[in-house]
């Protein structure tokens, strides 16, 4: 793609997210969501492959329908109560319709079916954008109206998403689909805390983005799309192998890595609010997710393909990729647990 067109599309996508996150009016928030969607669709379909075309069509239909539902809920609320302010959503139908629309945009269960198929049909960097940046605007709108959303809806969606994300990732051999189910599971943890402690939802989102970015950037740098490709990661770089291992374990929530922070705090908050059965079920579903993270970790770091080369030194490809973003992402994804008291103040 022409660099100028690429710059315009990325700038429009960033502008749409900023417009939505800073809006207090329903129309401007909807415009930001639409700008975000229209900017990402050419990026999805730029490979001129049938799978990419199919993914862009699916993405457009899902996002257009959910954006229309967002606008409908705003119009109904304005018609009944005379206010376009996001924080003054008082109609019950508008609350449920808006929550459903934003859950569809995020890919929360049970409206998650589009996310794995779309991530599988696009390049890894495009999948990274969809799994991280495209979640910011809908999540920001949910955080703005957190005190207006019915709590049972968020708890049901959260638990369902963690179950679907954990079970769906178990039998996958495609890494992009695995990351899609990982995204669904993490979004389930976020939405569970939406009406109980929105600050924990924001903390979870802030940690989820660098952890997922680090994992998928290493997949891109090592050209790993399947579990079979993951076996070759050690032949690219020992550093990439180590970071891939740690980023996956951090996504799984193992201490003492950064991914343990949100799970620990969320389970603690659920217990404080007398939702111990909910906390127990979410802890069990976290083990399902950890299972497929450990599976990828074992295959990518502890197994090597057959080799007939009688040399002790393992040969590696010479990398020409830009790795300047990896140190910062690694720092955030791995080493934040000691400053947990500072993050929760």
UniProtKB/Swiss-Prot annotation:
Record carries keyword Translocase: yes
Listed EC numbers: 7.1.1.2
Keywords: Electron transport, Membrane, Mitochondrion, Mitochondrion inner membrane, NAD, Respiratory chain, Translocase, Transmembrane, Transmembrane helix, Transport, Ubiquinone
Catalytic activity from the UniProt record: a ubiquinone + NADH + 5 H(+)(in) = a ubiquinol + NAD(+) + 4 H(+)(out)
InterPro entries: Complex_I_Subunit_2 (IPR050175), NADH_DH_su2_C (IPR010933), NADH_UbQ_OxRdtase_chain2 (IPR003917), ND/Mrp_TM (IPR001750)
Compartment(s) of residence: Mitochondrion inner membrane
A cellular component annotation (GO) from this entry: mitochondrial inner membrane
Alphabetized GO MF terms: NADH dehydrogenase (ubiquinone) activity
Membrane topology field: Multi-pass membrane protein
Record field: transmembrane: 1-21, 26-46, 60-80, 96-115, 122-144, 148-170, 201-223, 242-262, 274-294, 323-343
Biological role: Core subunit of the mitochondrial membrane respiratory chain NADH dehydrogenase (Complex I) that is believed to belong to the minimal assembly required for catalysis. Complex I functions in the transfer of electrons from NADH to the respiratory chain. The immediate electron acceptor for the enzyme is believed to be ubiquinone.
Family the entry assigns: Belongs to the complex I subunit 2 family.
Record-given protein name: NADH-ubiquinone oxidoreductase chain 2
């Amino acid at each position: 793609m022409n660099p100028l067109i690429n710059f315009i599309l990325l700038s429009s996508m960033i502008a749409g997210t900023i417009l939505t996150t800073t809006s207090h009016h329903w129309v401007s928030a909807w415009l930001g969501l639409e700008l975000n969607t229209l900017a990402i669709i050419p990026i999805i379909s730029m490979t001129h492959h049938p799978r990419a075309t199919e993914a862009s069509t699916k993405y457009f239909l899902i996002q257009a329908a959910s954006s229309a539902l967002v606008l409908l809920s705003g119009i109904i609320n304005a018609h009944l109560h005379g206010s376009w302010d996001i924080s003054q959503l008082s109609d019950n139908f508008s609350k449920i319709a808006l929550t459903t629309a934003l859950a569809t945009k995020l890919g929360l269960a049970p409206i998650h079916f589009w996310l794995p198929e779309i991530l599988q049909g696009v390049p890894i960097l495009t999948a990274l954008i969809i799994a991280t940046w495209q979640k910011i605007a809908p999540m920001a709108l949910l955080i703005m109206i957190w005190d207006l959303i019915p709590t049972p809806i968020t708890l049901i969606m959260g638990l369902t998403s963690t179950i679907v994300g954990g079970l769906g990732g178990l039998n996958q051999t495609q890494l992009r689909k695995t990351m899609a189910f990982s995204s669904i599971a993490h979004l389930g943890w976020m939405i569970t805390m939406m009406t109980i402690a929105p600050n924990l939802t924001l903390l979870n989102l802030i940690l989820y983005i660098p952890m997922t970015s680090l994992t998928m950037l290493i997949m891109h740098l090592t050209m790993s799309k399947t579990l079979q490709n993951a076996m070759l990661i050690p032949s690219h770089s020992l550093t990439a192998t180590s970071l891939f291992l740690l980023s996956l374990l951090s996504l799984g929530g193992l201490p003492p890595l950064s991914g343990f922070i949100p799970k620990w705090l969320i389970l603690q908050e659920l217990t404080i609010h007398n939702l111990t059965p909910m906390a127990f079920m979410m802890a069990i579903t976290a083990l399902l997710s950890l299972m497929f993270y450990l599976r990828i970790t074992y295959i990518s770091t502890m197994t090597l393909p057959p080799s007939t080369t009688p040399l002790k030194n393992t040969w590696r490809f010479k990398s020409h990729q830009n790795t300047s973003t990896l140190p910062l992402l690694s720092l955030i994804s791995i080493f934040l647990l000691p400053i947990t008291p500072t993050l929760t103040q």
